[in-house]
Amino acid sequence: MDNNYLDASHRKRLVCSNCNGTNTTLWRRKAEGDPVCNACGLYFKLHHVTRPIPMKKNKKHAVLPAPGISKL
């Protein structure tokens, strides 16, 4: 079986190792292999830091810049 594709029953049991979310359009994995939701995975890929938990909402959210990045 190809490990890149998780069956539906396994996907339902996944919990994001960063925000503890259980609902996402796509599951990703950290370098250590732990599952992360799409939002946390993309935030880390872009900012190289874990996504702050206060950003987690039950509804859609805006992506905030990483700490230390100023607006012009």
Curated annotation (Swiss-Prot):
GO terms for biological process: determination of adult lifespan; positive regulation of transcription by RNA polymerase II. The keyword Nucleus applies. One of its GO terms (molecular function) is double-stranded DNA binding. PROSITE patterns: GATA_ZN_FINGER_1, GATA_ZN_FINGER_2. The keyword DNA-binding does not apply. Pfam families: GATA. Keywords: Metal-binding, Nucleus, Transcription, Transcription regulation, Zinc, Zinc-finger. PANTHER family: BOX A-BINDING FACTOR-RELATED, TRANSCRIPTION FACTOR GATA FAMILY MEMBER. Probable transcription factor. Plays a role in regulating heme-dependent expression of heme transporter hrg-1. Modulates lifespan in a daf-16-dependent manner. This is Probable transcription factor elt-4. It comes from Caenorhabditis elegans. The gene is elt-4.
